[in-house]
């Protein structure tokens, strides 16, 4: 799934045809056929030593990029109610993808209830955020449902 090319790690995304996002069984079967990739990164270990267990699976259909995160954590919170809001204040995952070598990339941050912050950028600052129309086109299926909730303690997936 990953390879090194010119000092960069390149991930090849598997193509699975015939999967329609509305067919949840087919989507889950496709995800189940893909080996989970661990996310073994804690960006600020001095400030936040706890890191949840996180892995992801990804494929594309030619028309859709399909991404699933599996997260197990001790505390879960989902208070942000709008897209392009402060999703980083909730339990969330982050995904970066650079479709070419231009130096620009997309940054997706998604809460455990499916609220998204999407940016297109070349550097950390100065992001161009997705429009409401683009946000509406991104299909989501959060396992914890779409409704906000206060912090919960206990294992949640």
Write out the residue ranges for each language-model feature:
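Structural preference for beta-rich elements and adjacent junctions enriched in aromatics
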Residues: 4-157
């Amino acid at each position: 799934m990953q390879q090194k090319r010119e000092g960069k790690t390149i991930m090849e995304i598997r193509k699975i045809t015939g999967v329609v996002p509305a067919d949840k069984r087919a989507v889950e079967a496709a995800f189940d056929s893909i080996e989970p990739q661990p996310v073994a990164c804690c960006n600020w270990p001095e400030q936040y030593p706890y890191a949840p267990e996180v892995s992801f699976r990804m494929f594309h259909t030619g028309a859709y990029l399909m991404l699933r995160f599996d997260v197990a954590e001790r505390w879960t919170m989902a208070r942000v109610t709008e897209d392009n809001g402060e999703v980083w204040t909730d339990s969330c995952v982050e995904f970066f993808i650079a479709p070419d070598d231009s130096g620009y990339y997309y940054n997706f941050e998604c809460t455990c209830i499916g609220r998204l912050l999407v940016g297109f950028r070349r550097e950390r600052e100065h992001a161009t955020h997705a429009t409401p129309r683009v946000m509406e086109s991104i299909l989501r299926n959060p396992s914890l449902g779409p409704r906000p909730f206060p912090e919960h303690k206990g294992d949640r997936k």
